[in-house]
Regions:
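A short alpha->loop->secondary-structure connector
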Residues: 5, 68, 228
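Conserved acidic residues
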Residues: 8, 44-46, 211, 238
Length: 364
């Protein structure tokens, strides 16, 4: 982002296997015995803490004992600012626009100063008046989720839905009375331990009737402007996705280094056999570094149907191949693969749907 800033080194303080370099920048282990002079580093260099906030205090203490004077925790606000600045620069470099919902005007397209950002010819659906359009962002929660540290009131457009509700059949006290749950009608609630919030997505696909449907998480909510629906409709937006996340060395390798690589390879082979027209695009996209995480979105009902019709057959086959994993985190691999697949779906359908991005929060 800033050519005047030069990164001298990366630090880590865990027991995992870490690379010796990232690009041409050296990677060093950080502890209270680290000899900075032997590493040819200066204690006057600023150190940015790019890890989770719960670790900042401990790492700051180590850095101070070593002798570093300028220690800058990367806050949520700083992370959002840097991420958006990087994405704007990156998209410009590849000849595309990085369009954020909060940058669009809540005015009719014909008078909006930003109307030129969107190619209205890409959609043939006219929603008409905003107040005639129904819209809900469903916030997914499990009956077994840990409570938030602080209560977070839902927005007027948000509705809570319980995923994996079938597992609370014998513990009715875990679900509020009249709770919206994913185990009625056509459902896959029993797959929740692997499919995570996707069991709620499947239920919404089969049962929700709103014109615009969103999916969020009880710890992760979209940061939407108050008039988000007006901005979406008046600028003829089809889809809102979370601001993309950068991962290294690639989207593919990021998944394979954390999960069973054979599940990824099976998924790619499935795409090659069943969606050959998309395979080359998938291969290229997954070699890149960006995807929208967390299985979050807001989209028109017709788009949701197109996405789910494409997505779930792939995930069912991947889950049949991979089976159950002993580790509960690793067992959620269909949910993690879905994050990458949703991003891929909208990449290969860029000419079909108008897409913008929005930031999200994380609640401890």
């Amino acid at each position: 982002l800033d050519k005047d800033i030069h990164i001298e080194a990366y630090f880590y303080d865990n027991d995992e296997e870490n690379p010796e370099t990232i690009g041409e920048v050296p990677v060093f282990c950080l502890n209270k015995h680290t000899d900075i002079q032997a590493l040819n580093l200066s204690l006057d260099y600023p150190v940015y803490l790019g890890t989770r906030g719960v670790f900042h205090e401990r790492i700051t203490e180590i850095l101070k004992k070593i002798g570093f004077k300028i220690i800058k925790p990367v806050t949520v606000e700083m992370d959002l600012t840097l991420r958006n600045q990087y994405l704007e620069k990156y998209y410009t470099s590849i000849g595309r626009e990085f369009i954020k919902l909060d940058k669009l005007k809540g005015l009719p397209s014909s008078t909006s100063a930003n109307a030129g950002l969107i190619n209205s010819s890409l959609t043939n659906i006219n929603f008409g008046l905003t107040n005639e359009i129904s819209a809900s962002v469903y916030v997914v929660k499990s009956p077994f989720d840990r409570p938030l540290q602080q209560e977070y009131p839902l927005a007027s457009y948000e509705r809570q839905i319980y995923a994996g509700a079938v597992f609370a059949e014998n513990s009715p006290d875990l679900l509020p009375e009249n709770a919206l749950r994913d185990d009625t009608g056509d459902n896959i609630s029993a797959k929740n331990k692997q499919f995570c919030e996707l069991t709620a997505l499947y239920w919404l696909w089969k049962h929700a009737g709103e014109d615009i449907i969103g999916l969020a998480h009880y710890r992760r909510h979209f940061l939407l402007p108050q008039d988000w629906k007006e901005r979406m409709l008046n600028n003829q937006i089809n889809v809102i996705l979370p601001t993309p996340l950068y991962v290294a060395p690639s989207v593919e390798e990021n998944f394979k280094s954390r999960h069973d690589p054979s599940d990824w390879e099976f998924m790619m082979q499935y795409l090659k056999n069943n969606h050959p027209e998309d395979f080359q695009s998938a291969n290229k996209f997954f070699k890149g570094n960006l995807y929208s995480p967390c299985n979050m979105f807001v989209m028109k009902r017709e788009v949701l149907d197109a996405l789910c019709t494409w997505l779930f057959p792939i995930l069912f086959q991947v889950a049949d191949h991979g089976g159950q994993k002993e580790d509960s985190y690793l067992n959620r691999y269909p949910g993690f693969i879905s994050e990458r697949l949703i991003s891929l779906f909208f990449e290969i359908n860029r000419s079909r749907f108008n897409l913008v991005y929005a930031d999200k929060n994380f609640l401890p």
